[in-house]
């Protein structure tokens, strides 16, 4: 029977969850602060130069102006959601790094266990993967206590 690896203590898990949740909470706070400000504050007030540009753009045909507006709205929506996206990427990277570290730790611990010499143990490996050679070939009269050298393939 193999023993299960020890579970990390609950305070460590709580600290890990707090560290992972902090970027998301900060992103939500920044997003709510930017959403509470009206859109009129972000746009410059119309001046003589702006009024002529808007009028000439509409008069010349609105297709180029509408494509520019579409690009601007896409970019502004990405910039508005940037803290949330950043927090999501940070959490995903942290989770991936934690998973890789756990798997590497498990592989190295398992490798150390397999390399240990086992004396007087029950062979649980299938017979085709085990080579057995008697160590005490000179004492053939005592057949009850044959010691084997076991090599695993």
Swiss-Prot record:
Cytoplasmic compartment segments: 106-153
Annotated transmembrane regions: 85-105
Signal peptide positions on this chain: 1-27
Residues listed as glycosylation sites in the UniProt record: 50
Extracellular side: 28-84
Gene Ontology biological process: Golgi organization
Positions of region (Disordered): 31-67
InterPro entries: FAM174-like
Alphabetic keyword roster: Cell membrane, Glycoprotein, Golgi apparatus, Membrane, Signal, Transmembrane, Transmembrane helix
Domain of life: Eukaryota
Keyword Lyase listed: no
GO cellular component terms, semicolon-separated: Golgi apparatus; plasma membrane
Homology family: Belongs to the FAM174 family.
The name this protein goes by in its record: Membrane protein FAM174B
């Amino acid at each position: 029977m193999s023993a299960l690896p020890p579970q990390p203590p609950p305070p460590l898990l709580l600290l890990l969850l707090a560290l992972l949740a902090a970027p998301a909470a900060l992103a939500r706070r920044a997003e709510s602060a930017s959403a509470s400000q009206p859109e009129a504050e972000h746009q410059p007030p119309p001046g003589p130069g702006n009024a002529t540009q808007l009028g000439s753009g509409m008069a010349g045909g609105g297709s180029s102006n509408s494509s520019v507006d579409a690009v601007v709205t896409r970019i502004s929506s990405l910039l508005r959601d940037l803290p949330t996206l950043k927090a999501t990427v940070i959490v995903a990277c942290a989770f991936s790094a934690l998973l890789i570290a756990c798997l590497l730790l498990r592989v190295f611990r398992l490798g150390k266990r397999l390399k240990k010499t086992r004396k007087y143990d029950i062979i649980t490996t299938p017979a085709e993967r085990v080579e057995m050679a008697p160590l005490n070939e000179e004492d053939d009269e005592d057949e009850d206590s044959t010691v084997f050298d076991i090599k695993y393939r």
